């Protein structure tokens, strides 16, 4: 028993020190990232956002508009072959209309679908004041891809959604996000690469292109703190 006590007494400070270094490393990476995208104070001024762009799939372009009010609601509207595609998320409910996915009219989404989408309501970037939002982070070390080095940080949100982010060692910007999502009852790994970062007139830096499962999303226009009618977040 005495030997065990001595072992614990010796090891505990080392374990605590290791955990402290790990947390500090993750926080340092996050702090540099926030600085690189315009700074905490600027991002905390973002109350609403309207984005126009298009998704390119196998040479076909699908225009979309995304409107969001911070922690109130997110709505995406698109049209393809004359069919409307709508996606609405609020803190308590969500709706979806996608004729190509079996939903010909606006229908409520399941609790599981809503849980996976709740983090999207935070439009001030998930890493801004992440701890006060109920999220935790973990430094996973370094990784390399195409000759470039990246820091890996896992974030677990208050909604228990997990994502692994890859931060470019040189620019401090996010290059990739990996997460597991459930679709039609099956788990699926989702990898999203983001690039073409641009500083918009508001003074924050946002990626204008992303790639996911062979689809390219291109952002043409971003409006910050524009007036958005909250009624657009009402389903049926």
Predicted region positions:
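Bacterial Sec-dependent N-terminal signal peptides
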Residues: 1-26
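Flexible, processing/modification-adjacent segments and terminal tails
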Residues: 22-35, 96-161, 182-188, 195, ...
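N-terminal mature ectodomain segment of secretory-pathway/periplasmic proteins
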Residues: 28-102
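Well-ordered beta-strand positions enriched in small/hydrophobic/aromatic, beta-favoring residues
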Residues: 51, 76, 94, 137, ...
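Structural motif
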Residues: 57, 80, 145-146, 201, ...
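Catalytic loop of the DD-peptidase/beta-lactamase superfamily, centered on the K-T-G motif
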Residues: 69, 85, 90-93, 102-107, ...
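Residue-level detector of high-confidence beta-strand sites
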Residues: 88, 142, 176-177
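Gly/Pro-enriched, hydrophobic low-complexity segments
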Residues: 149-235
């Amino acid at each position: 028993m005495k030997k065990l006590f001595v072992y614990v007494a010796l090891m505990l400070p080392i374990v605590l020190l290791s955990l402290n270094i790990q947390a500090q490393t993750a926080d340092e990476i996050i702090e540099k990232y926030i600085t690189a995208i315009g700074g905490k104070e600027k991002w905390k001024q973002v109350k609403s956002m309207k984005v126009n762009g298009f998704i390119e799939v196998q040479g076909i372009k699908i225009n979309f508009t995304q409107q969001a009010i911070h922690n109130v609601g997110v709505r995406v509207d698109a049209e393809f072959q004359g069919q409307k595609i709508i996606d609405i998320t609020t803190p308590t409910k969500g709706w979806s209309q996608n004729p190509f996915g079996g939903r010909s009219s606006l229908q409520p989404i399941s609790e599981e679908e809503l849980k996976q989408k709740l983090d999207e309501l935070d439009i001030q970037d998930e890493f801004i004041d992440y701890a006060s939002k109920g999220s935790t982070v973990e430094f996973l070390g370094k990784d390399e891809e195409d000759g470039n080095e990246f820091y890996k940080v896992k974030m677990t949100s208050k909604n228990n959604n997990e994502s692994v982010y890859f931060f470019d060692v040189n620019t401090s910007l996010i290059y990739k996000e990996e997460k597991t999502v459930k679709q039609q009852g099956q788990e699926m790994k989702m990898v999203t690469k983001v690039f073409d970062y641009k500083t918009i007139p508001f003074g924050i830096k946002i990626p204008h292109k992303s790639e996911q499962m062979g689809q390219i999303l291109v952002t043409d226009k971003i409006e910050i703190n524009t007036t958005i009618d909250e009624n657009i977040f009402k389903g049926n």
